[in-house]
């Protein structure tokens, strides 16, 4: 009989793939959601999607209240012509807690050229989200968006999949989308070709 942890891991993987592929095209092969000018596709329920430069389209500008200071807005437009990594997270999410150090490493890299990671906190109370940021020494800004309304602005990224990480090129077009936990090396590998473009 398989070990209970293996069964749980298999079940969680199946649920993640099911959530990532929650709507399908007529052939049943692609998860598709549409919003703004960028159209999100997850071919066959893939959890890492790369967009060639010729196929990239901009997302709508996003802005929202800061988790740490609700009187201040975090704005994508403040990083014009800079690479930005968007990350939907929640302090309740195990993979989100695991990847926070990786995101901080990427933030340190991007900050050298004026880029940033922008977190989008979902499904938390503001005090829990703020405590998580302070307790983990997170230096990048986060938007407080508990119902994840920004998902529509992000081209229909599935609001049910957390963490979700989107690497935007300098024109703020999605270059790579991760519908799962990431590592710093994966993000740096995705960012490197965008830095010279």
Residue ranges and their predicted role:
Residues 1-65, 197:
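N-terminal targeting signals for export/organelle localization
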Residues 22, 93-96:
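Short cysteine clusters
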Residues 57-59, 79-81, 112-115, 127, ...:
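Extracytoplasmic
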Residues 85-86, 117:
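Hydrophobic beta-strand anchors of alpha/beta hydrolase catalytic cores
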Residues 97-136, 146-153:
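Structural microenvironment flanking redox-active thiols in thiol-disulfide oxidoreductases
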């Amino acid at each position: 009989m398989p070990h209970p942890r293996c069964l749980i891991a298999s079940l969680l993987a199946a649920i993640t793939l099911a959530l990532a592929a929650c709507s399908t095209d007529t052939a049943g092969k692609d998860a598709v959601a549409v919003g703004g000018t960028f159209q999100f596709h997850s071919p066959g329920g893939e959890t890492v999607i790369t967009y060639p430069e010729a196929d990239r389209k901009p997302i709508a500008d996003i802005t929202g209240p800061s988790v740490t200071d609700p009187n201040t807005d975090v704005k994508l437009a403040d990083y014009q012509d800079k690479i930005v990594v968007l990350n939907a997270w929640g302090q309740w999410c195990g993979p989100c807690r695991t990847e926070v150090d990786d995101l901080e490493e990427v933030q340190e890299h991007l900050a050298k050229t004026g880029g940033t990671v922008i977190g989008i906190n979902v499904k938390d109370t503001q005090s829990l989200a703020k405590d998580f940021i302070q307790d983990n020494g997170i230096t990048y800004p986060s938007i407080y968006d508990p119902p994840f309304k920004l998902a529509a602005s992000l081209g229909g990224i599935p609001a049910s999949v957390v963490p979700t990480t989107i690497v935007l090129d300098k024109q703020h077009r999605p270059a790579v989308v991760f519908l799962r936990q990431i590592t710093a090396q994966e993000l740096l590998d995705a960012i490197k070709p965008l830095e010279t473009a």
